[in-house]
Regions:
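Non-catalytic, conserved peripheral segments adjacent to functional cores
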Residues: 1-91, 109-149
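Short, exposed beta-strand "edge-strand" segments with a Pro/Gly-rich flavor and a Y/T-containing core
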Residues: 90-98
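Short beta-strand His + acidic residue motifs that chelate non-heme Fe in jelly-roll/DSBH
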Residues: 96, 104-109
């Protein structure tokens, strides 16, 4: 899908546990401005939604696993209408950069709660949280063509 970056993350393991690089400024032309982490319970869906201006940099390393769903909803994109579903998380550590106009959402598919880290390139609600959120919340539209079941 045009503009979507999917990078398999390598867990370097030893007797102490593991370490994985999740973002390097010398690998991608992407500059995070904030970060957050979320935990999602088994069977719970987050999204789908999209952004007009913001790109997300999702990091799925566990615990837990997700089905990540992506739909290209960009009017003039060369991959408009394309759909992609991948399993990410503890079993498939992955970093995914999602550009504006790509509808995205994920569902926890593990028994245990699953964690996701996001490093978006725009501040949520802008400087000092004084702006409208850059979100088209497809999950609130019962007629949405974008469904995660």
């Amino acid at each position: 899908m045009q503009g979507v970056v999917i990078k398999k993350l390598e867990k370097h393991k030893d007797e102490r546990g593991w370490l994985a690089e999740i973002y390097r400024s010398d690998e991608f032309d992407f500059k995070p401005t904030m970060s957050y982490v979320s935990s999602t319970k088994n069977g719970v869906v987050r999204g789908p939604h999209e952004h007009k201006f913001q790109s997300d940099c999702f990091v799925f390393v566990g615990p837990g696993n997700f089905e990540l769903h992506l739909w290209d909803n960009r009017e003039n994109g060369e991959t408009k209408g394309e759909y992609l579903k991948i399993e990410v998380g503890e079993n498939n550590p992955t970093m995914v950069i999602v550009p504006p106009g790509v509808v995205h959402g994920y569902k926890c598919v593990s028994e245990a709660d699953a964690c996701c880290i996001n490093l978006p390139d725009k501040l949520y609600k802008g400087e000092g949280k004084k702006e409208e959120a850059d979100e088209i919340r497809w999950e609130k539209d019962s007629n949405s063509p974008f469904k995660i079941v």
